[in-house]
Amino acid sequence: MTDRVKTALLAMQRHNWEQGVAAQAFLEAGDSEIAIALALEGANRQAADGRCCHIADSTACTDPCAVGEALIFAAEQTGDPFLRAARDKLLHWAMHDAPRSPSGVVYHFQQGRLIWVDSMYMLPPFLARAGEYDEALRQLDGYWATLYTPENGLLAHQWSDETRRFVRRDAWAVGNGWAMAGMVRVIALLPEAHPGRNRLIQRVQQLIRASLPHQQPDGAFRDVLDDPTSFREVNFAQMLAYTIYRGIAGGWLDRSLLPHAEKARAAALAEVDRYGLVRNVCGAPYFDRPGVAPEGQAFHILMEAARIK
């Protein structure tokens, strides 16, 4: 089944973040040659300012960094000067040129001064893999401080620094999944003695606690976690399962969470069709209805890789 999901992912059109999460999925699944090929294509499409996977007139700031860990891996494995230069240019963008809030948080786009929860996956793992541990933590701390909503214990989707209010306060399921998965990766990359590591672990645990009461009897979740009228979707189920599997393997989540992960995984497996498409995820291109999406394919692969390990 996973091979069909991989083939379907490779056949899909992909934006910058989708190219990045696809590369990460193949990297974590041990498909190194495909991960390198995807990273190379991201480097081939590098903009003059350093952003990778550039398509059309995208103004995204953090999404082009989603390919970052795979790009570093590709540069290390091949020794290719082109890939090393692309890695360095992307890191320079992320560290120095990307537009930031007054507190130093990288905005999601070059205009609008918007902070999105998605960025917690797109940028900090790349920074951590590049050895910029403190900057990775600074970004995660800033996103958390801006987007955490204590009334439900979850993260809102979008904040505007221009209007000083939420653009979308909803606890978007996939957005909280991006946040959990991004923090999981940074936790694994940080030195165990790093003072910020336990802070991230506690935050992942908090999001899991706040999410689980919203799990449906079949293991799936709603598109907005605490809104039972929003549509059913299974990509967050995959993201949650991935998070739990990796947390248990890392020794910082309790094995009592495993049944929740297995239930979530079962809901997602039931949606894989004969073409290898994971149906009823929050669907591309508008993400306002159930459908299919490259990120839904990628997190199926990531979930299965984490479960095996």
PLM feature segments, named:
Residues L114-M120, P124-D223, S230-A241, S256-V281, ...:
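Extended ligand-binding clefts on enzyme/binding-domain cores
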Residues M1-G20, L27-G68, I72-K89, D97-S101, ...:
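CBM-like carbohydrate-recognition segments
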Residues M1, Q24, G30-S32, L38-A39, ...:
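Charged/polar interaction segments and conserved charged motifs
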